[in-house]
Amino acid sequence: MAAKGNREKIRLVSSAETGHFYTTTKNKRNMPEKMEIKKFDPVVRKHVIYKEAKIK
């Protein structure tokens, strides 16, 4: 049986408060801090900062 990986599923939530989010994975060992990345929000049709949140 294979070992479990280090990657964890996360949700990137828009800081524009539109409710839009992306899902991705990240390696907890290499990136212990919360992820912030600039991506396109199709609701406001602009690039905004997306912040990491847990998937429920």
From Swiss-Prot:
One of its GO terms (cellular component) is cytosolic large ribosomal subunit. The keyword Ribonucleoprotein applies. It holds the Pfam family Ribosomal_L33. The keyword DNA-binding does not apply. Coiled coil: none annotated. It comes from the Bacteria. Keywords: Ribonucleoprotein, Ribosomal protein. GO terms for molecular function: structural constituent of ribosome. One of its GO terms (biological process) is translation. Belongs to the bacterial ribosomal protein bL33 family. HAMAP family: Ribosomal_bL33. This is Large ribosomal subunit protein bL33. It comes from Actinobacillus pleuropneumoniae serotype 5b (strain L20). The gene is rpmG.
